[in-house]
Each structure stands twice: as C-alpha cells, then as structure tokens.
Amino acid sequence: MSQPPKILLLYAHPEPQDSVANRVLLQPAQQLANVTVHDLYAHYPDFFIDIHHEQQLLREHQVIVFQHPFYTYSCPALLKEWLDRVLSRGFANGIGGNALAGKYWRSVITTGEPEDAYHPDGNNRYPMEDLLRPFELTAAMCRMHWMHPMIVYWARRLQPDVLSSQARAYGEWLASPLPEEER
C-alpha cells in the first residue's frame, strides 16, 4: 500500500477560540502525519504574508484543503488576501504558472445557517454549489482538480454527536483523500 498524499490544510478563522466546530474538525487532522495544519491567522496576525514560504508549502503538498467559515458569501479577509497574493501569475497561473497543476483543492466550510437557507426559496437564494463557484474557478485557473466540498451547515447549533460524526468522516477522508482510481 502506498503512502497517503501530503495534505496542506490552510485554516483561516479570525476568531478560532469562538469556533467549537472548527476546533473539533481540526482534531483528526492534527493527529495525521500526512497533514500539515497551517493556521493563517496565527501565522500572519499582521496580514504580512510571506509569499515565497507559502508557495514552497504548496509545492511540497499534493492536496490543498481550505478550511474556513463562510463569511459574506466568501472567506475570511486573510484567506482572500492569501489567495490574491500567493496564487500569483507565473506561479499558479498564466504563462509558466504550473506549480499547482494536477494538485487537488478541497474547501471545508462551516456556515452559520442551516442547509435549507442555501436554496432558491431560502435566505441566501442560491445553493451553496453556486456560492462556492469563485473558489472552483480559482482552482481551475490554477489547473487544480476541484474536489467536492465538505460543508458543515449551522455549525454553532450542531449537536455534539453530529459534529463528532462529521469530524470523524473528515479525518477518514484526510487519511485517504484521493479518488480511488488515483490511490
């Protein structure tokens, strides 16, 4: 059996102490040798991103996981800054920008609303699949494989056993993230 691929888990939450769901989700990742958990807010509290360091981390990993809360139909500000600065032309896209080609992108998102809020008749009027399209397009721009996102709806209100079950499933996926035909 081959080694599991190296995973870079980019965690972006500006108030991690307030997010029980994200703390629980991170627990299995922190136990796996093939996963590098990189807390962007802990690493860059001043938002001064070391672009070369971040690009080197990306080069060293095959699967990139973006774990964050869903803020204003997007991601927290530091992750947006990271995406704009690190995934630069000539590195991740454009002429000569092939560093991420063939790697995998998976978004792991927590929301403050239930799943039915992301529906034409719901508060947000659109399904989550549509709202995540900018991330999917960014992955495509970088020539990365878009993996089906993991969405933890209504994260603050989940019963502990449901949250534990989702964290367990997340941990199992992290241990073997690639599609079966590529393992």
UniProtKB/Swiss-Prot annotation:
Topological category with respect to the lipid bilayer: Peripheral membrane protein
- What is the designated name of this protein? Glutathione-regulated potassium-efflux system ancillary protein KefG
Where does this protein chiefly localize?
membrane
The family classification in the record reads:
Belongs to the NAD(P)H dehydrogenase (quinone) family. KefG subfamily.
Where in the cell? Answer: Cell inner membrane
Q: InterPro entries from the xrefs?
A: Flavodoxin_fold, Flavoprotein-like_sf, K_H_efflux_KefG, KefG/KefF
Q: Which reaction does it catalyse?
A: a quinone + NADH + H(+) = a quinol + NAD(+); a quinone + NADPH + H(+) = a quinol + NADP(+)
Keyword terms: Cell inner membrane, Cell membrane, Membrane, NAD, Oxidoreductase
UniProt GO cellular component terms? plasma membrane
Species this protein is from = Pectobacterium carotovorum subsp. carotovorum (strain PC1)
Alphabetically, the GO molecular function entries are: electron transfer activity; FMN binding; NADH:ubiquinone reductase (non-electrogenic) activity; NADPH dehydrogenase (quinone) activity
Assembly and partners are described as:
Interacts with KefB.
- What gene is behind this protein? kefG
Sum up the protein's function in the record's words.
Regulatory subunit of a potassium efflux system that confers protection against electrophiles. Required for full activity of KefB.
Q: A Gene Ontology biological process annotation? A: potassium ion transport
EC number(s) on file:
1.6.5.2
